[in-house]
């Protein structure tokens, strides 16, 4: 439960449970009027676990390894200077992206993290990182670039001579699991299988560096009457994206609490402020909104903004 998480004196972050707890707390705050400390739970994720009684050193990685930006990946911050895992890097997107519908004040932070994370997740795939930075490039063709390496280490921990001084290294623990496990076991079906989460959420826009993130597709247990998308602009200037509508629509931003376009027929232009985010709800054109008890309600029945 959320109470069990918040009863901890410090972070116990490992893999997926704490990010799911963040979503649960945000949802219950919005929908049920709870008052859980979402900020504390988010800090526990991004600052990582420092307790010797937990998975010490587990967190969200920030920075560059060699020439590669690995910010946003999840794994050990301390093991050999850093050891990220693809499965763990993908999984937080599942709860974090829909979470911003309920706590839009975190849209910018989550949008920035997701942009970095989605970019860095490519580095686990043998067709997306150069051969000098992977442990078994001679075997990459067996993956068809659909199966990734399990992990990405800051430095090789097997002692392979050709990887001395190389950072990062796409790698896997398979050969360590049992004596005789082949090098091929560095490629990981369990790590690659959740990539559909990213495939469902992430879509490019006409502006490089700005992604359209679907806030509904992994929000599994709620009514979703309208499309909702998170856009984060990492640039120093306002950028104009092309919004592709599914119907004649009005666009309402629940971060700024304002309409940003009305009566779009097919494609429209939307401005995303510099270094900021929008969470855009696509409403059927002419939908009436009302403010009641701090909530914005569409057509007298669907809450689109909770605070």
Please place each PLM-identified region on the residue numbering.
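C-terminal capping/lid segments that line or modulate ligand- or cofactor-binding pockets
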Residues: 89-100, 104, 136-203
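Well-ordered alpha-helical segments within folded domains of soluble proteins
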Residues: 1, 14-28, 80-99, 194-196, ...
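Solvent-exposed beta-hairpin/edge-strand motifs
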Residues: 246-259
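C-terminal beta-strand-rich structural cap/linker in extracellular carbohydrate-active enzymes
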Residues: 264-306
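Carbohydrate-binding surface patches
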Residues: 166, 171-247
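Carbohydrate-binding/catalytic loop surfaces
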Residues: 3, 19-36, 46, 59-84, ...
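Long, well-ordered core segments of solenoidal/helical folds
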Residues: 1-13, 36-69, 112-129
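Membrane-proximal bilayer-interacting regions
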Residues: 74-135
């Amino acid at each position: 439960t959320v109470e069990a998480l918040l009863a901890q004196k410090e972070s116990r972050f490992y893999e997926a449970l704490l990010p799911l707890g963040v979503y649960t707390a945000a949802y219950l705050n919005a929908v049920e009027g709870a008052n859980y400390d979402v900020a504390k739970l988010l800090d526990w994720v991004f600052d990582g676990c420092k307790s010797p009684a937990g998975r010490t050193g587990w967190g969200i990685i920030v920075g560059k390894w060699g020439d590669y930006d690995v910010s946003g990946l999840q794994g050990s911050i301390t093991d050999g200077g850093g050891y990220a895992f693809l499965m763990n890097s993908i999984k937080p997107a599942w709860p974090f992206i829909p979470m911003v519908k309920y706590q839009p004040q975190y849209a910018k932070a989550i949008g920035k993290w997701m942009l970095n994370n989605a970019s860095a997740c490519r580095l686990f795939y043998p067709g997306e990182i150069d051969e000098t930075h992977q442990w078994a490039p001679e075997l990459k063709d067996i993956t068809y670039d659909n199966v990734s390496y399990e992990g990405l280490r800051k430095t090789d921990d097997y002692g392979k001579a050709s990887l001395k001084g190389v950072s990062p290294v796409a790698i896997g623990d398979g050969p360590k699991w049992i004596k005789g496990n082949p090098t091929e076991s560095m490629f990981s079906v369990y790590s690659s299988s959740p990539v559909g989460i990213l495939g469902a959420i992430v879509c490019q826009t006409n502006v490089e560096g700005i992604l359209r993130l679907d806030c509904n597709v992994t929000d599994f247990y709620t009514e979703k009457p309208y499309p909702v998308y998170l856009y984060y602009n990492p640039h120093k200037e306002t950028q104009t994206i092309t919004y592709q509508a599914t119907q004649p629509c009005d666009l309402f931003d629940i971060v700024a609490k304002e309409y940003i376009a009305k009566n779009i027929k097919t494609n429209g232009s939307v401005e995303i402020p510099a270094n900021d985010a929008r969470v855009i709800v696509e409403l059927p054109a002419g939908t009436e909104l009302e403010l009641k008890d701090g909530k914005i309600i569409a057509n007298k029945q669907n809450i689109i903004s909770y605070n």
